[in-house]
Design a protein with these regions (language model features):
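Conserved ABC ATPase "signature" region
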Residues: 10, 90, 105-123
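Helix-to-loop junction immediately C-terminal to a conserved catalytic motif
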Residues: 50
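Catalytic Walker B motif of ABC-type/P-loop ATPase nucleotide-binding domains
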Residues: 152-155
Length: 253
């Protein structure tokens, strides 16, 4: 697998470092999930990795002509514009073609294919604001896919979803990854990614903590206990892994 983007000895933050000495590489076919508490530096790390925020120290290296499909945590589509789901997905083709470029039938076909990949082929003409929350998120993922990216990057893609919608969204990302797409996502919920990602990174700028490893390495109870600062156990139920604080009180976030 080839390297897509890499941070070496990086310090990240806005004006002052939130986290230092970060070494992280994303390769073709990777599925990396960045987890940690709210305000822990996850989005800052993602923005630095994608190049929209320069590192304060160290360096960032990216493959030539790297194409990234980005799905932000919150997307504001002005309700005064009655955009259809298809219109939103076509924005991805505009980004791929560049400012001022005119879209042709081939662009529309690729956009339709992107919407089909996320299971919404029959909603091309549906007004975006009349979609459910889960359908809107899938449409935004389709917009990112329409740009034919090498890397799909998502910031809290399941935020605000109910458990069924979260599971469906993660199943979609698993399918896209298994189809050969590299995926990097940010989540504050470890359980959302524990059965999907190939690697986990943990970021908590409040404690200056940064760890990255394979899923098996990071989901060891002793590793999680050190990261979360309290005893944690991992159980497998019906083929899925769940994370629990040993003191009781339900699953860990």
């Amino acid at each position: 697998m080839g390297s897509l983007v890499r941070l070496a000895g990086a310090a990240i933050g806005y004006g002052r470092p939130l986290l230092r000495d970060l070494d992280l590489e994303v390769r073709s076919g990777d599925f990396l999930a960045v987890v940690g508490p709210n305000g822990g530096g996850k989005t800052t790390l993602l923005r630095t990795l994608l190049g929209s925020l320069p590192p304060l120290g160290g360096r960032r290296e990216a493959a030539p002509s790297l194409r990234v499909g980005y799905v932000p945590q919150r997307e504001a589509v002005d309700p005064l514009w009655p955009l259809s789901a298809g219109d939103v997905v076509l924005m991805g083709r505009v980004r791929r073609a560049g400012p001022g470029a005119r879209l042709d039938d081939a662009d529309r076909e690729r956009a339709r294919h992107a919407l089909e990949r996320v299971g919404l082929a029959d909603l091309w003409h549906r007004t975006f604001h009349n979609l459910s929350g889960g359908q809107r998120q899938r449409t935004l993922i389709a917009r990112a896919l329409a740009a034919e990216p090498d890397l799909l990057a998502l910031d809290e893609p399941t935020s605000g979803m109910d458990p069924a919608a979260e599971l469906a969204a993660m199943d979609l990302l698993r399918d896209l990854h298994q189809g050969g797409l590299a995926v990097v996502m940010v989540s504050h919920r470890l359980e959302a990614v524990a059965n999907y990602a190939a690697r986990l990174a943990f970021a908590d700028q409040g404690r200056g903590l940064w760890r990255v490893g394979t899923l098996d390495e990071m989901l060891r109870p002793e590793a999680l206990s050190a990261l979360y600062g309290r005893p944690v156990t991992v159980r497998e139920e019906n083929g899925r892994r769940f994370v629990y604080p040993e003191a009781g009180g339900g699953r860990a976030a």
